[in-house]
């Protein structure tokens, strides 16, 4: 989107936020992540990046149905080192688009809060003076995608056009979420994992191939060493349902995000159970 000045951009952002019933900060964050994603799609690294995580889920179900502040990707064809990732993102920042936004890499660090896959966190700034928006991109490698990544058509927030980017298929997104919820059991402190499973299945469940999802879950659990959840999921769900801590976390999530206000914790657990019963033979 071409804007005359930062004030006009802020006006567009404010209007979109009102339309979607979400904060202007969230819309600005997603707009700048979109600007970065378009640069990736136009760079020599287009076929090395695979979009996943919250930003992809938001694109699938709608920004007003799932908010996110970061970009999650997996990379193929490169060894995951600080030096390689810094060069890749420095190159991406030089891609010129008529949107008046300039990007800079401000930091590279290891992702330490999860051991699912090795990862690097890239800190960037999106600058449209005086607007400056800090961004985070998480990059992993070795992700188990079943059967393979897909070409995803990503619609722009403001422009009536689309870009093409490689992404996780729906079944792999769901498989990773199911594995996370069940393997971490009551130790999982992220209500959004439950929400993501529920909303994806509610809105896109008919598009989900059950055999592919079963294979994706089996491969994901094998990779993560959590195969026991395939047979123990009913007992695990019983513990989850009875957890006061998880229920309190869910209620807090419902209060914070308007799009979750009509969904109970029991609803999300029922969705997990329904999916598992449908795919576990």
What spans do the regions from the language model cover?
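Structured mid-to-C-terminal alpha-helical surface segments
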Residues: 1-49, 59-67, 71-281
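Catalytic metal-binding/acid-base residues of hydrolase active sites
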Residues: 56
């Amino acid at each position: 989107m071409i804007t005359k000045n930062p004030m006009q951009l802020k006006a567009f952002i404010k209007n979109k936020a009102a339309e979607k019933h979400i904060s202007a900060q969230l819309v600005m964050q997603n707009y700048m992540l979109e600007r970065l994603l378009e640069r990736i799609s136009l760079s020599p690294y287009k076929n090395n990046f695979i979009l996943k995580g919250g930003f992809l889920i938001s694109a699938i179900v709608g920004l007003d149905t799932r908010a996110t502040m970061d970009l999650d990707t997996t990379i193929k064809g490169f060894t995951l080192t600080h030096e390689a990732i810094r060069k890749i993102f420095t190159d991406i920042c030089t891609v010129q688009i008529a949107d008046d936004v300039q990007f800079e890499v401000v930091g590279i660090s290891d992702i330490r809060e999860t051991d699912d896959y090795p990862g690097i966190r890239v800190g960037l700034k999106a600058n449209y003076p005086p607007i400056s928006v800090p961004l985070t991109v998480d990059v992993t490698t070795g992700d188990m995608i079943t059967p393979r990544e897909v070409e995803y058509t990503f619609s722009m927030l403001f422009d009536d056009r689309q870009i093409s980017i490689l992404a996780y298929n729906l079944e792999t997104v769901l498989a990773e979420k199911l594995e996370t919820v069940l393997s971490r059991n009551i130790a999982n402190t992220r209500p959004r994992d439950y929400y993501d499973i529920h909303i994806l299945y509610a809105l896109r469940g008919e598009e989900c191939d059950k055999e592919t999802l079963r294979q994706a879950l089996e491969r994901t659990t094998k990779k993560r060493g959590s195969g026991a959840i395939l047979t123990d999921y009913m007992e695990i769900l019983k513990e989850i349902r009875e957890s006061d801590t998880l229920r309190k976390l869910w209620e807090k999530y419902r209060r914070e995000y308007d799009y979750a206000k009509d969904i109970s914790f029991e609803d999300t657990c029922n969705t997990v159970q329904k999916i598992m019963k449908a795919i576990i033979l």
